[in-house]
Regions:
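Accessory "access/gating" subregions that flank catalytic or transport cores
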Residues: 64-83, 94-102, 111-116, 130-213
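Active-site cavity-forming subdomains of large catalytic enzyme subunits
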Residues: 10-18, 22-126, 138-139, 143-145
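Generic N-terminal targeting/processing segments that precede catalytic cores or assembly contacts
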Residues: 1-12
């Protein structure tokens, strides 16, 4: 569909977009405590945040307000078994934006901030997004961006396996639709709307088949 024409009133739409306003407490922590504040400081600002939250974002804040500290507040043990949901990675582009072309620094920040909210694949997804966003400032092609995310996370984690799969299927000649179906078929247990790994796998497919966009 066509992109809507811009109107000034659209700026207020961000107030209802949790993948935008949820980064505010982290940026406030960096502003006040420095670029390399620790996860306890990030957690303190998340605990005091006031926006409407859902999912593991809300669970983590509730845990913090009960006196729990990172990384326990975001752990699967204390986050209703859902700590691998996508909440952190849809917000994690800020980690790369504040570290233009400094991929390792973006990864470091994402590791600390991510454990305030999630655990495991949720954090790995955020790290991959942070790395790709940081690399995008100087990358000359999409492959460089894709590889920055792919190689920023452990080879044995689920998110990395999905990155490996989609590039292998692309190189084997699969079309966009075939690749999309292959990913869903290989990982049926993760084929739901909140899975951090699966949703980031879809992002990876979009990068690979976007003709440089």
């Amino acid at each position: 569909s066509a992109i809507a024409a811009w109107t000034p009133s659209m700026i207020n739409n961000q107030n209802s977009q949790d993948d935008i306003y949820c980064l505010t407490p982290f940026l406030e922590a960096m502003r006040d405590k420095g670029a390399y504040c620790d996860w306890y400081q990030y957690g303190d600002y998340w605990k005091k945040s006031t926006p409407e939250l859902w999912g593991i974002n809300l669970n983590a804040r509730n845990n913090l307000q009960k006196g729990m500290n990172p990384p326990d507040c975001g752990s699967y043990k204390n986050n209703e078994g859902a700590a691998d949901q996508l909440d952190f990675w849809i917000e994690a582009d800020w980690c790369g934006m504040v570290c233009p072309a400094q991929v390792n620094s973006a990864i470091d920040i994402a590791w600390r901030a991510g454990h305030v909210i999630g655990y495991g694949e949720s954090v790995y997804g955020g790290i991959a997004v942070a790395a790709m966003q940081s690399k995008a400032f100087t990358a000359t092609n999409v492959t460089e961006i894709f590889d920055a995310g792919r190689y920023s996370i452990p080879a044995d984690c689920l998110t990395r396996k999905m990155f490996d799969d989609v590039i292998a299927w692309k190189n084997a000649g699969q079309t966009y639709d075939q690749n999309f179906a292959s990913l869903r078929n290989k990982y049926p247990a993760h084929n739901h709307g909140a899975c951090a790994s699966m949703d980031l796998g879809f992002v990876a497919i979009g990068l690979l088949y976007g003709n440089g966009n």
